[in-house]
Amino acid sequence: MRGGESGKIFYGWWIVVAAFLNFFFVIGIIFYGFPVFYTSFVEELGFTHAQVTQGFFLGFLIVGLPFGLVAGAVIDRVGAKWVILTGVALVGTSLLLMARMTKLWQYEALCVLEVLGYVFAGPIATQVLVARWFRARRGRAMGIAYLGLGSGGVVAPMLINYLIRAHGWEHALEIVAIALLVVLFPVGIWVTRSTPEEMGLLPDGATGSAATGVAIADTASSRVAEAVRTKNFWLILFGSTLAIGAIGAVIQHFILFLKDQGYSSAVAARFSTGLLVASLAGRILVGYAVDLVSKKNAMAVFYFLIGASVVLLMAARVPTAAWAFAAIFGFSMGADYMLVSLVTAECFGTSSLGKLLALIIMGYSLGQWGFPWVVGKIFDARHSYDLAWKLTAVAGMAGGLAIYLVSARKEKARLS
């Protein structure tokens, strides 16, 4: 972890700590923990299963897609630091206001605001931030950062369930919002730096001949216009949209589904926690091994397993089947977002990574927020999740196949 010849710890590892905390709160706590609130929204505010997820889908359609594309360009122009800080402010504000909502339209409006914050503070800016600071050790650095996502996810269900029982869902939202703002604002202001060049450094802390290698490697970065005309770009976009859509469908409905299967809120939260503990194990494995194996093949295998494991939900009334699903699906989630940025960087370089990731993430966000809404509509119409889970399983496996067809080295060589 030491860089250059000075023996000092390379500052990029402090960037990894900042990214870890960002993933912990913005994705781990908010994305994976927020579905715990859905039961309260359904029981106390009268929302349907589709309505509790359609707010985020509307947010994606209204602001996520257009502002996501803008976020990528802004990151490349002004740096990830200020984009992340803006997003943190928006997410925190939306949660504080959500604690006062009483109507569906208020919920939907605040979901739009939260999605905008997620776009700025979430995967796009954080992945670009880490990718700019590392090259040779990019996979390991990204893996450590993504442990924040898994760690937040592990903590979130049980913690939020406790806060709701102890203080009510309104105060629980306020507590989560304040914690997010108190931690991420100081870290963003005093720790985060958008690029190593701001501190007179190079990726990985490289010096001398190693620095020359870094410079030469980045000259191979593909222009955005060239990249979007390649088969690889569309395979990554299509595959990640399907697989991450499957993840979103399960995560957003898992607790509601388990309640429908006869489990209590506390037991459902334990299953959700178990799933996310398994995802943490998957992230540790991927983070350790990703620089040693084919990134796109690893991504394909994990995505295929995501889809295949959903079949177990058909027998979820049996606790053993529910735990088996949580273990396999959770472990397979270890490659969900992280490998998207690594495979994209491997195919196209990093000079325009912000713009390319914005395009890809906005694409898979259609699945991430759209699939849960579709699953909710199916449940509201049929009063059963069976058809929804069958479609989700097919989507995940098809996503894995698409990623397997990516030919990273050949495509990059042709574009360079």
Kindly give the residue locations of the regions a language model identified:
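Extracytoplasmic
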Residues: 14-40, 44-49, 157, 250-255
